[in-house]
Curated annotation (Swiss-Prot):
This is Abscisic acid receptor PYL13. It comes from Arabidopsis thaliana (Mouse-ear cress). The record marks 144 as: Involved in ABA binding. One of its GO terms (biological process) is abscisic acid-activated signaling pathway. A motif (Gate loop) lies at residues 69-73.
């Protein structure tokens, strides 16, 4: 952990996806397959645990993620802190890698949309992260929010394709 004097920031990104909750959750909860919808992820190798896959225990699983070239990092090591299939909550922490997202922790919550509970899903991804030295809180939030927004847009496209 960094010094308690380290500046931290937090934000949330909300995306409504035109797909039923069970489909959206089945993709999001697959800790061992982030590349299914996270387009900056080139590959994922499970270091420990089952990643929440069928028959595998999820909580405490650790994955090594290789990122695509051109991204401002090469790899990330991440731990699944919580995976709750009843409340549709997933918590992930970044515990290593060659990036600037120190002490990053995200919580993703999935709920059926009040507009159309059978056909729409609302995904809320909230996070907290240290503000890297030499960077502003606003720039950090802008960067992370855009990655999350891109991933959730990709998730929406994937679910739409799967429903055809």
């Amino acid at each position: 952990m960094e010094s308690s004097k380290q500046k931290r920031c937090r934000s949330s990104v909300v995306e409504t996806i035109e797909a039923p909750l069970p489909l959206v959750w089945s993709i999001l909860r697959s800790f061992d397959k982030p590349q299914a919808y996270q387009r900056f992820v080139k590959s994922c190798t499970m270091r420990s645990g089952g990643g929440g896959g069928k028959g595998g225990e999820g909580k405490g699983s650790v994955r090594d993620v290789t990122l695509v070239s051109g991204f401002p990092a090469d790899f990330s090591t991440e731990r699944l802190e919580e995976l709750d299939d009843e409340s549709h909550v997933m918590v992930v922490s970044i515990i290593g890698g060659n990036h600037r997202l120190v002490n990053y922790k995200s919580k993703t919550k999935v709920v059926a949309s009040p507009e159309d509970m059978a056909k729409k899903t609302v995904v809320v991804e909230s996070y907290v992260v240290d503000v890297p030295e030499g960077t502003s809180e606003e720039d950090t939030i802008f960067f992370v929010d855009n990655i999350i927004r891109y991933n959730l847009t990709s998730l929406a496209k994937l679910t739409k394709k799967m429903m055809k």
